[in-house]
Amino acid sequence: MAVNQEKEKAIELAMSAVERQFGKGSIMRLGNDEPMMRDVQAIPTGSISLDIALGVGGVPKGRIIEIFGPESSGKTTLCLHIVAEAQKRGGICGYVDAEHALDVGYARKLGVRTDDLLLSQPDTGEQALEIAEMLVRSGAIDVLVVDSVAALVPKAELEGEMGDAHMGVQARLMSQALRKLTGTIAKSQTCVIFINQIRMKIGVMFGNPETTTGGNALKFYASQRLDIRRIGAIKNGDNVVGSRTRVKVVKNKVAPPFKEVEFDIMYGTGISREGDLIDLASNENIVEKSGSWFSFNGERIGQGRENVKEYLREHPEIAKDIEGRVLEKYGIGKSGAPSPRRRTSPRRPKVAARSAAV
């Protein structure tokens, strides 16, 4: 007992010395640290099934997220939906457009308040990451999107000649930036999303030849990594009106990883929330499906998936009721944190079922 008291006294003296030298809050007991003990706060993604798969109701605040995939797979669309959801909740968002390709009209259609969005189109990778750091350090930004890592061109490469080899310059740039950013991001509770592109590794005989740009640092620092792919076309007659999209959570530090979900991205309007809702609700028998007819609370609400989507758009109160029941079923509460006793992996809706319903 005396030994324990001596140890306790020694620890208190050491903690006092640390606080004197480095300031109050530089060391503390974990149980007394309220910010560390609270539930993970999250921002919805615009897709209910993806919110459930991520385990906390969306992308977590104070963390780094990587969204990667092939061209035209929906990476920017997903990020703009996250920005729109953050703005709906009164958040301030920033967009570092290194690709110089942001479509403002499309962003508005997805619900982004472009008048309130902070936009930067930097010339170099160093400038882009410096701007990102300054915005995060302000402590006022809720979501910051960097689009994309592949477009962060180092200054040395810009000033050099075409054909010059610059081995590992971009990887070193990303590694240094993430070392500087990671602590500030956690303190400011900013969700920083990096969009990334896919490249092919040369000479890979076995395994996956795909890799992401910018080295390995982002893979380590990211709390969540989302692999987004276009897996099919949604047609209205002969016209392609959207894409069936699959997202796999390949890394997740705040919930179990490797969940997969599918949803519709409609051209011009983004993620189909109603379609996502129908798939989840019918899987859990909240909405009953008999042949091509869908029923809710014993009443038929439409024949065919597209007609039901239109019905839910016209009757938002019914859509809200169904959404509430779905979220309750999967254990996502008002705080966004899932109940540990409930299953959080959504069943994956099948593409064939969708096309048959249409």
UniProtKB/Swiss-Prot annotation:
Alphabetical list of SUPFAM superfamilies matching this protein: P-loop containing nucleoside triphosphate hydrolases, RecA protein, C-terminal domain
Compartments reported by the entry: Cytoplasm
Tagged with keyword Repeat: no
MF term (GO), any: ATP binding
Record GO biological process: DNA recombination; DNA repair; SOS response
Gene Ontology cellular component list: cytosol
Highest taxon listed in the record's lineage: Bacteria
Keyword Ubl conjugation: no
Binding of ATP, residues: 69-76
Comp. bias (Basic residues): 340-351
Keywords: ATP-binding, Cytoplasm, DNA damage, DNA recombination, DNA repair, DNA-binding, Nucleotide-binding, SOS response
Pfam families: RecA, RecA_C
Region (Disordered): 331-358
Gene3D superfamilies in the cross-refs: P-loop containing nucleotide triphosphate hydrolases
Family: Belongs to the RecA family.
Leftover remarks: There are two genes for RecA in M.xanthus; recA1 seems less functional than recA2.
Role, per record: Can catalyze the hydrolysis of ATP in the presence of single-stranded DNA, the ATP-dependent uptake of single-stranded DNA by duplex DNA, and the ATP-dependent hybridization of homologous single-stranded DNAs. It interacts with LexA causing its activation and leading to its autocatalytic cleavage.
Name this polypeptide is given: Protein RecA 2
Gene source species: Myxococcus xanthus
